[in-house]
Amino acid sequence: DDTIKERMRKSTSKVNDIILLADAPMIGADGSSLTAIKLFEAQVIPALLFNCESWIGITEGQINDLQSFQDKFLRKLMHLPISTPKAILHWDSGMEMMRWRIARQKLLFLRKIMLKDNSNICKRAIINEAILEAEGLGHECRGLATTVGLQDLRDSFKTTSKGDIRRA
């Protein structure tokens, strides 16, 4: 929890710089927020979600904090009141919600591990986790895969492509 809050705190100055750039006549002259959103996606999101595929047991509160950070950026960028419905905010920006960004990274990471040789220690840990019915990355990814309509990647990693995961 502290790590996520610290990352958000460190990213705040970048977010403010992006908003200032977007308000500048040369960048925001067309009235579009696309450039600022792309800058946010390129500079802030990678720093914020670095290594998120290993975040086992992330809480709903932490996901909400991350989503609020993104929503706050969008509201400031587009000069929208706090009363603007979140659904409209997400639809108009075209930005992926934090929950699904993290889920995609976890699923892609699990797929990458499962494509490794059977002697790989990480792959063996995932398999042992399933055998022992422990709650770790494999367990979380099984739930995520079911939610987005994919097969369990621990079994179907060879038939599930990166594109399938991204589209889901």
Regions inferred by a protein language model and the residue ranges of each:
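Extended C-terminal regions of large enzymes
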Residues: E41, C52, D65, F69, ...
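Basic, alpha-helical interaction scaffolds
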Residues: D1-I56, K112, S119-N120
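Acidic, serine/threonine/proline-rich low-complexity intrinsically disordered regions
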Residues: W55-I63
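Short hydrophobic/aromatic segments of transmembrane alpha-helices and their interfaces
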Residues: I19, L80-P81
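Amphipathic alpha-helical interaction surfaces
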Residues: F50, K76-H79
